[in-house]
From Swiss-Prot:
Annotated positions binding Mg(2+): N9, E384
Lineage: Bacteria, Bacillati, Bacillota, Bacilli, Bacillales
EC number: 2.7.2.1
Binding site for substrate: R90
Co-factor binding comment: Mg(2+). Can also accept Mn(2+).
Protein name: Acetate kinase
EC main group: transferase
Pfam families per record: Acetate_kinase
Gene3D superfamilies named among the record's database cross-references: 3.30.420.40
Presence of keyword Phosphoprotein: no
Organism (species): Staphylococcus epidermidis (strain ATCC 35984 / DSM 28319 / BCRC 17069 / CCUG 31568 / BM 3577 / RP62A)
Gene designation per UniProt: ackA
Length: 417
């Protein structure tokens, strides 16, 4: 029997949502409420392929949820709010407390609040959404799905930093990793595409958007990932620096007179591709600039791809080989130029990719390797909301033994040719 699940991502002044029919994994509607708390809040919802926008006063998240539910009824997506049988909430940080998704209780709320010191900009906002939905829909399960949970299978040698050990014991300083819901979704889908059990596969997942992270997934479990204690670590990103020598922070402070917080702001918002080029963090802009001969843009693209390229080599060594490389997220799904730069030179480890196939894939699923390539290379559009909805069914105990799409797709594979 089909169930309607609401996947939610609450920000401090926004609420993104998707209403999904499960187990078919069919999108009913999606939308976003922006500028919550201001006089000109913006409510956007998709109805029958058309995007409808309304500007009104929305004072808080509870009011935003009520407006969203009323819109569902107005457009006959539901007859009553009881038609929604569960909600799933993206929560950025679960620390070591939450190695998997969990049904929200008062105790879970308190634990998420305690973890806010690890994600001060995100966890409190995520909680506002959870509390609004729990108040307005008290009879259904509300499941928290954490960006960090998927990476809790990393071994100590992957997540510990070479710092005094008591920093880990006392303050929880370690690598946590992020984008876990995306890495989990695309790795499962990759196994379906190649027609092999995920337990038998070594997968390198490249989530490349404005934020980017790489994950080594062995037998379906994350054993390492590029982001760290925060999403600032790892590869170069749109506005984030990625890894650098930590001694640069006091050096920059001394040279510029800036505080530590101000330097961190620069590393998060003024660095990466934006910092390198001085013009844009948008890869499309930089690709055009490079085509027209701008040297700094060309170097930035090469550097960006090189960092990802190195992680692939590192993670292949870590897993004693690789069976599948997956590209996902905005850049990974749409930029054949970056994919090509990343893959160039990996033939020595069995990666034989087809430039024509690579160039033809933009935002759609498929292979970009030659049929004879030992390592399969895939583009897989991510769908974190579907992954969240699956967890609502699983942890909210809503499964009435109707097979989920992931189960009846297990043997579906895509031909290489």
């Amino acid at each position: 029997m089909s169930k309607l699940i609401l996947a939610v991502n609450a920000g401090s002044s926004s609420l993104k949502f998707q209403l999904i029919k499960m187990p078919e994994e069919k999108l009913v509607t999606k939308g976003v409420i922006e500028r919550i708390g201001l006089s000109d809040s913006i409510f956007t919802i998709h109805v029958n392929g058309e995007k409808l926008t309304d500007i009104r006063d929305i004072h808080n998240h509870e009011e935003a949820v009520n407006i969203m539910l009323d819109s569902f009824k107005e457009h006959e997506m539901i007859k009553d709010i009881t038609d929604i049988q569960g909600t799933g909430h993206r929560v950025v940080h679960g620390g070591e407390t939450f190695p998997k998704s969990v049904v929200v209780t008062d105790e879970v709320e308190s634990q998420i609040e305690e973890l806010s010191e690890l994600a001060p900009l995100h966890n409190p906002a995520n909680l506002m959404g959870i509390r609004a939905f729990r108040k307005l829909l008290p009879e259904i399960p509300h499941v928290a799905v954490f960006d960090t949970s998927f990476h809790q299978t990393m071994p100590e040698q992957a997540y510990l930093y070479s710092l005094p050990y008591h920093y880990y014991e006392d303050y929880g300083i370690r690598k946590y990793g992020f984008h876990g819901t995306s890495h989990k979704y695309v790795s499962r889908r990759a196994a379906q595409i190649v027609g092999r059990p995920i337990e038998d596969l070594r997968i390198i997942s490249c989530h490349i958007g404005n934020g980017a992270s790489i994950a080594a997934i062995d037998g379906g479990e994350s054993i390492d990932t590029s982001m760290g204690f925060t999403p600032l670590a790892g590869v170069t990103m749109g506005t984030r620096s990625g890894n650098l020598d930590p001694a640069l922070i006091p050096f920059i402070m001394e040279k510029t007179g800036k505080t530590a917080d101000e330097v961190l702001e620069i590393l998060n918002k003024e660095s990466g591709l934006l910092g390198l080029t001085g013009t844009s963090s948008d890869l499309r802009d930089l690709t055009e600039e490079a085509k027209h001969g701008r040297q700094r843009s060309r170097v930035a693209l090469d550097l960006f791809a090189s960092k990802i390229h190195k992680y692939i080599g590192s993670y292949a060594a870590r897993m004693h080989g690789v069976d599948v490389i997956v590209f996902t997220a905005g850049i990974g799904e749409n930029s054949h130029i970056i994919r090509g730069k990343v893959l160039e030179g990996l033939e020595f480890m069995g990666v034989y990719w087809d430039p024509k196939k690579n160039e033809s894939l933009h935002g759609e699923e498929g292979y970009i390797n030659y049929p004879h390539s030992p390592v399969k290379v895939l583009v897989v559009p991510t769908d974190e909301e579907v992954m969240i909805s699956r967890d609502v069914i699983k942890y909210g105990k809503l499964n009435d033994n109707t097979p989920k799409k992931e189960e009846f797709d297990t043997n579906e594979s895509i031909e290489v040719n």
